[in-house]
Structure formats: C-alpha cells, structure tokens
Design a protein with these regions (language model features):
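OB-fold ssDNA-binding interfaces and closely related basic DNA-contact patches used
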Residues: 1-119, 169-175, 180-187
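Short linear motifs in intrinsically disordered/low-complexity regions
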Residues: 5, 147, 180-183, 209-213
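Conserved binding-pocket/active-site segment within a compact domain
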Residues: 98-198
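Interfaces that engage single-stranded nucleic acids at replication/repair/recombination sites
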Residues: 191-217
C-alpha cells in the first residue's frame, strides 16, 4: 500500500500556525481526559489512533450548536479555505446567538479505537494545545509511513496524558499529551464518507439535524 505522506506534513504545518456513526466523544478539560456523556476520566488509557482518518476544517456555531461546516480529510489533501471566504464577517451580528464569538471556528477530529474491545471514540479540538498535539501525531505518522515498516504497523498507539505550564496572565494552562507507546496495523474498515457542504446561511437559528450528519458525530 502506497500512502502520500505530504498531506499529513502539510496539515501539521497548518495546525502549528494557530490558525456517521454514533461514536463516543473524548474530551480534554483542564488536565482531565473525559469520555462520553458520563464524563468518565480516562487519563492513562491507551488507544490506537486512526491518523489516516484525521478530519479538519471550519465549523460554524450558533447558540452552542453546529449549523454549518467546511470539512475534509487530511488524506485527501484537504486544506481549509480562508476565513473571509466563509461569510459572517459583520462582527456586530456575532453577539446575537453566539456571545460575541466568531461563529466559524477551526476544529480538528481524530478517531481512536480500543484494540481489545473495538470501541470507537472521537477526539475533537480547536485549542492551541490540542492542535500542537495533533500536529506532532501527524508528523510521527508521516515519518512512520515513510519508513515502510515490514509489519505494516503504521497507526500510532497512544496513551492519553496531560501537561501544563504557567501563563503570566492566565495562570496554569493545561495541554493534552498524546504519547506514542506502540504501533498498530490499520483495520480494514472503510472510511466514513463526508457530508455534503450546506449553502451559506445568515446568522439565524440552528438547523436541527445538521450535527447528526457529520462523520463520527
């Protein structure tokens, strides 16, 4: 199998610039990895990462819900469009329904699976620390693929960790750590298709069923 690793290295650079199945959500909150609606703490657990299915792009929020998106797979060499190409540029309208925050946010998603149980989870992030962790993982994956391991094990097996640093104004800042502890062969399961992009919408109400159509959501 031949894999072009250039796309993964390109996306790693983008991440450093600061710029569907019913899968359980994995979240990193203030130094704690939390799984699912019950927010079970899973620091130190191990997962195989489907870096080859890394998904990223712009997600549009309204009143705490996804209302539009421009997403693509890294493996397809997808690069997010520039922010000014997405519309919603009038900051005065951001206050209504979005608390003054830009409704369009860059977000990245990494599918993970348990090698024993087969459980699938999805880690999504739009933070600087999360982007740095994913950038490092994409680079390590590209290096591994370029080395052409004879056993075909190109997916990183990671342990969920955490670190922190002291910010002069904001105090202690927690950042996620994805430590590579092993490598695994990719399963034969086909990659989920992407949803079709929706036409531009005004800053009005959320679309009820849009979030359910996003892969892994």
């Amino acid at each position: 199998m031949t894999i072009d690793t250039t796309a993964f290295r390109d996306m790693a650079a983008v991440l450093r610039q600061r710029s569907g199945a019913n899968v359980t959500k994995l979240a990193y909150v203030k130094g704690k990895w939390k799984l699912g609606r019950d927010k079970i703490e899973v620091n130190g657990t191990q997962w195989a990462a489907r870096v080859d299915w890394t998904l990223g792009g712009w997600v549009r929020w309204f009143d705490g819900r996804i209302t539009d998106y421009r997403l693509g797979y890294v493996a397809d060499r997808y690069m997010p469009p520039k922010r000014d190409e997405l519309g919603d540029l009038d900051e005065e309208k951001w206050e209504w329904g979005n608390y003054g925050r830009d409704p369009w946010q860059l977000a990245w998603s990494l599918p993970l699976f348990n090698q024993v149980s087969g459980e699938e989870v999805l880690y999504s992030t739009d933070t600087m620390g999360g982007k740095d962790a994913l950038a490092a993982l994409l680079t390590a994956y590209a290096d591994r693929v370029d080395s052409s391991p004879a056993d075909g094990k190109i997916l990183p097996v990671i342990e969920l960790g955490t670190s922190s640093y002291r910010h002069p104004q904001r105090g202690e800042i927690h950042v996620p750590v994805l430590d590579i502890i092993d490598w695994a062969a990719p399963p034969t399961k086909p990659r989920p298709p992407l949803p079709k992009a929706e036409p531009q919408k005004a800053l009005s109400g959320p679309k009820d069923d849009l979030a359910d159509s996003i892969p892994f959501n």
